[in-house]
């Protein structure tokens, strides 16, 4: 095994993990990084593993919220305990918001990938779009907390998440931007976005897990995949913790500037 190849895969894992929580598109950065590192990773096995690593990190960060929602939601279903009503409704809204992207992703994933096959240029353009969206909401300060989310909010956020099926569009950006535009507090928008990420990522992992075992290069690249997976878990965990602080301070404009700079640079030099 070439040591340099191993290092490149670890760098990809760190990059994917770091960019997964923040609104700059992890998949887009993977495309760009593969281009500039001279790697040609075919199929979806590697990206699937990286997403699974990020999923584990998100579960660790939000384990208390998940436990509270599960306990209170079950309590409301079984005993109609009013204290659990808000959490039960929150769960229902998460399910509703999952449906649009889930259905379209399952039915048209191959068609979407084929349509946007010029990965590097598409990524550059979508980074510019993301930068513009983040710039437009830079000064928004919502007032809605978890218990004040409504059905309309869940539906709009769910359909907005479909935009993230386009390569290079950030999933967190595609959900946080409309959530804040609908008046959700930044911490509520962030929590809803990443709790929504869990069923989406879990469903995608389950549906595509056979791709990993049918990857003809799995034996050859087992160690690079493994180290990249571990790197993805660690990087996602710390990046998400950091992004929580950024959201609390309302400094999304920095991500907007970053997306503009990288998008323009890629269009010029790639």
From Swiss-Prot:
Q: Where in the cell is it found?
A: Cell membrane
GO BP, one annotated term = cell wall organization
Bilayer topology = Multi-pass membrane protein
Instruction: Give an example GO molecular function.
Output: undecaprenyl-diphosphatase activity
Reaction it catalyzes = di-trans,octa-cis-undecaprenyl diphosphate + H2O = di-trans,octa-cis-undecaprenyl phosphate + phosphate + H(+)
Q: Does the keyword Transmembrane helix apply?
A: yes
State the family named in the UniProt similarity comment for this chain. Answer: Belongs to the UppP family.
Which additional comment does the entry carry? Bacitracin is thought to be involved in the inhibition of peptidoglycan synthesis by sequestering undecaprenyl diphosphate, thereby reducing the pool of lipid carrier available.
Function description: Catalyzes the dephosphorylation of undecaprenyl diphosphate (UPP). Confers resistance to bacitracin.
What is this protein called in UniProt? Answer: Undecaprenyl-diphosphatase 1
